[in-house]
Amino acid sequence: MPALLKRLLFQVGPHPNERTFTLSSVSTDGHYISLRPFVKPSGDELSFPFEWAFAGTNETVKVNDQGNGVVTQDFNFWLDTNVYLNVPNTHRGEVNTTWKNWDSGCVEETGAVYPFGADKESVSFRELWQPVDPSREDLVIVSPNBEKFSSNARSIVLKVTDEAYDGLVIVIGRWIQGFLSQKNNNTIEGLNFIRLLEKDSGKSEFLLSYGKEVNKIPQSYENLKKGSTVTSNGLNWEVIEYHA
């Protein structure tokens, strides 16, 4: 089933914090995107106001159910903004994570990365996630005992097919997140992100719009079907998943 998760806490070292409005979208078929914009960017953050962003298809993640509410997910991201931008001391390769369901309905994610090299010391991290109802306009907490919303939430995924770009848009219920990156650019000028919310009125509201080519990202998702093509300002996107 599709899922929309809001991050509540990020921790490296002894002091937890949360400086972002992070939402992660996971489609019914397992495609995913996580956008992590700063709430109050400052200084150098103003030019690229993101802690991080990553995305991938279900071919870039291995999911294993360990039982008792524990799942491991091993990621080889399609887009990793730190890698794309060649940020110093960035982990390269697979990221191994463990997800544990809490009785409250929150989900704890733990793992480790190797920013200084695979043969160097690891850096452990911890994140806490709250599933929210993607069929609602507001960020409504999902009760651990009532997930009927999941059967009604649409799950649509579009992937760019142009040789000059990589791109993915994931529609989960009313919430849309997407990225578009220029291949072989590797600067912030080559990155574009959107986060949209479909309101009760039927109109979509931009919660996040970043980049000079956001108009190449589709922003209408009606009358689609799997395998069809959507053209947005000259860029072709393929519908790789459609559950509505």
UniProtKB/Swiss-Prot annotation:
Entry-annotated residues carrying Phosphoserine: S143
Keywords in alphabetical order: Cytoplasm, Nucleus, Phosphoprotein
GO CC terms, sorted: cytoplasm; nucleus
Record's subcellular location: Cytoplasm; Nucleus
Cytoplasm in keyword set: yes
One Pfam family per UniProt: HRI1
Annotated family: Belongs to the HRI1 family.
Subunit text: Interacts with HRR25. May interact with SEC72.
Name the UniProt record assigns to this protein: Protein HRI1
Annotated gene: HRI1
